[in-house]
Structures are given as structure tokens and as C-alpha cells.
């Protein structure tokens, strides 16, 4: 059974979103997604300064099984990326909700968060 923290929001494309409370969010992929992918061997990080659009591809995760596009769950600008994933992509498997965030995004519109699923809603999509 996948871990689904209650304090996060979720996209049905398996990204999690942490509202940092300052107009920014932290984004990663869910435990369910990393489990489906298997051992992650590479993460293509977005460029800082990139404008992202909700539901459009902004990153890529490659595993021993497959390559999977990662979709922006909100509209905004990438303000920071997790460079630790360049040297340790396996963090996605080991700690998908802690050390393995992919990017921090400055929201264009805070209302985007209202369009995301809560933990119960996400749990229902993967049941």
C-alpha cells in the first residue's frame, strides 16, 4: 500500500504538491508513482526560470523499467530544483516525500491549489 501524506495535495498524474505558505509550492512524485516505475536511475530537472503550465510536461524520470514524463501540477515559474537528484536519483525511491522533491514553483495563481486532490481523493484514484 502506498503512503499518502495528508498534508499534501495531489495531481491525478501522480505528482504531490506541498504548499509552502509563501506563494510557492514544492513538487515531487508520489510513492505510488515511484513504486510503479521501479528503480529510478535518472531525473531530468527543469531549468530554474522556466514557466510551467499545469498538466504539461516539465520533468522526466527514468527507471530501469521506463521513462515517465512528470507534469506540472500548477501554473508558475520554477524557482529552485533539487540538484541532489543529479547525483542520487534513487532518492525518488527511498524518500519520495522528503529528500526527493523535484522543483519549487512560484505560483501564478494560488487558486490552482484548489484544483488538486486531497489525500482521500488521490487514494481513490489509485485504489
From Swiss-Prot:
One of its GO terms (cellular component) is glycine cleavage complex. Pfam families: GCV_H. Residues 24-106 form the Lipoyl-binding domain. GO terms for biological process: glycine decarboxylation via glycine cleavage system. Its cofactor is (R)-lipoate. The keyword Metal-binding does not apply. Keywords: Lipoyl. Binds 1 lipoyl cofactor covalently. The modification N6-lipoyllysine is found at residue 65. InterPro entries: 2-oxoA_DH_lipoyl-BS, Biotin_lipoyl, GCV_H, GCV_H/Fam206, GCV_H_sub, Single_hybrid_motif. The glycine cleavage system is composed of four proteins: P, T, L and H. Belongs to the GcvH family. HAMAP family: GcvH. The glycine cleavage system catalyzes the degradation of glycine. The H protein shuttles the methylamine group of glycine from the P protein to the T protein. This is Glycine cleavage system H protein. The lineage of its organism: Bacteria, Pseudomonadati, Pseudomonadota, Gammaproteobacteria, Oceanospirillales.
